[in-house]
C-alpha cells in the first residue's frame, strides 16, 4: 500500500505557470524552504502577572530554494535572469508535486506569487569534474498544501457542517 510507510522524497517535479518552458524546467535535484511558521504577539491580561497570552499574529513563509544541474535552454532561467539582470519581476505560481512509483502526485504544494530573489552557480573547478549546479532562490506570498487525505477531510468537514446546519 502507498500509505503504509512514509514517502521517499526523491521523485518529484516542479511546474511553473510560465511560458515558454522546456522539458528540463520540471527537473530539480533539491527543493528546500517549504516552511511556514506562526508569529505570535504577547498580550498581558490586566490583573494577571503570572503569564502573558500569546496571540497568533501572522504567518511567515521562508524562501524557497530550487537546485539542479545547469541545462542549456530554460524558460525558468530566462524568467529569473530577466528579474536579476533587468529588474523585470513577474510573479508566477508554481506547483511542487511529490510523485509515487506510477508518477502520480501524492502530495502537492501550490506556491503563490513567487519571484526570483537570487540566482547562484556552484563553483567551477577543473580538478573535480563535478556537475555545475544552479540554485534559484524564490520569495513568495504563501503556499497551499494538497494531498488526497486532506482534500477528503476538508470535503467531509464541509458535508458534516451542512448536515449540522440543516438539523
Where are the regions that the model predicts?
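Glycine-rich, low-complexity intrinsically disordered segments
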Residues: 1-167
Amino acid at each position: 500500500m502507498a500509505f503504509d510507510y512514509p514517502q521517499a522524497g526523491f521523485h518529484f517535479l516542479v511546474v511553473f505557470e510560465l511560458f515558454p518552458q522546456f522539458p528540463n524546467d520540471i527537473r530539480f535535484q533539491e527543493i528546500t524552504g517549504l516552511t511556514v511558521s506562526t508569529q505570535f504577539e504577547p498580550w498581558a491580561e490586566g490583573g494577571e502577572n503570572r503569564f502573558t497570552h500569546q496571540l497568533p499574529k501572522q504567518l511567515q513563509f521562508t524562501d524557497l530554494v530550487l537546485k539542479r544541474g545547469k541545462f542549456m535552454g530554460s524558460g525558468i532561467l530566462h524568467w529569473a535572469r530577466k528579474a536579476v539582470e533587468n529588474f523585470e519581476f513577474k510573479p508566477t505560481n508554481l506547483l511542487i508535486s511529490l510523485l509515487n512509483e506510477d508518477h502520480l502526485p501524492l502530495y502537492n504544494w501550490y506556491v503563490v506569487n513567487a519571484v526570483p530573489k537570487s540566482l547562484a552557480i556552484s563553483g567551477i573547478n577543473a580538478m573535480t569534474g563535478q556537475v555545475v549546479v544552479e540554485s534559484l532562490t524564490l520569495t513568495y506570498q504563501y503556499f497551499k498544501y494538497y494531498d488526497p487525505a486532506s482534500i477528503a477531510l476538508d470535503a467531509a468537514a464541509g458535508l458534516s457542517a451542512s448536515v449540522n446546519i440543516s438539523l
